[in-house]
């Protein structure tokens, strides 16, 4: 992507639990191509995605991460946490286990980002609000996925997902 903010966000993932995601975005993934990241009206893909913050998408052998344009002015640290989540999705299959893992990764990365870049905690940003909610769930569960998992399983957007998916083995 040529959006400067995504380059900044990727740099912020260095040395965090999201480094795997950073490498996946740079091309170390199932497709062997870099992931294309862009802001996009998600309702153009599917009306059901209109309110989503972001989606990971695979199309014609390439991976994409589309981020809701409402986050265009989010701090790069919050975008970094979001990217660490979306880069987990590398195939056409999704599951509750994969989402639980991705949301937990996002919460852990956000916690790490705040330690390194406290200025990321800009409370004006809707994305920062999301990240802080995830961080609270992580802390409430004593740094396990206990409460994040409950939140994922209760999410309307995931109600038709299977428990597991072929490309994802839950640790």
Predicted segments, located by residue:
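Residue-level detector of alpha-helical secondary structure
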Residues: 10, 14, 131, 135-138, ...
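Active-site recognition of the HExxH zinc-binding catalytic motif
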Residues: 81-93
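Soluble non-cytosolic domains of exported or imported proteins
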Residues: 73-78, 82, 96-97
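Long amphipathic alpha-helical segments with strong coiled-coil/leucine-zipper propensity
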Residues: 65-72
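Pan-zinc metallopeptidase signature
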Residues: 139-171
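Auxiliary, metal-adjacent structural segments of Zn-dependent hydrolase domains
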Residues: 1-64, 122
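Charge-dense, intrinsically disordered terminal/linker segments
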Residues: 44, 91-92, 101-106, 118, ...
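Post-HExxH zinc-binding segment in Zn-dependent metallohydrolases
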Residues: 94-133
């Amino acid at each position: 992507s040529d959006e400067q903010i995504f380059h900044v966000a990727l740099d912020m993932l260095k040395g965090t639990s999201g480094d795997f995601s950073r490498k996946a975005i740079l091309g170390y993934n199932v497709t062997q191509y870099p992931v294309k990241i862009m802001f996009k009206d998600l309702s153009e893909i599917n009306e059901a995605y209109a309110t989503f913050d972001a989606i990971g998408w695979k199309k014609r052998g390439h991976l994409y991460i589309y981020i809701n344009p409402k986050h265009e002015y989010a701090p790069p640290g919050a975008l970094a946490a979001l990217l660490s989540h979306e880069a987990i999705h590398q195939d056409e299959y999704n599951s509750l286990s994969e989402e639980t893992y991705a949301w937990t990764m996002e919460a852990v990365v956000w916690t790490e980002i705040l330690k390194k870049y406290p200025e990321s905690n800009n409370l004006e940003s809707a994305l920062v609000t999301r990240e802080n909610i995830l961080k609270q769930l992580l802390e409430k569960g004593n740094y396990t996925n206990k409460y994040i998992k409950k939140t994922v399983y209760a999410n309307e957007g995931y109600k038709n997902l299977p428990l597991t998916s072929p490309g994802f083995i839950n640790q």
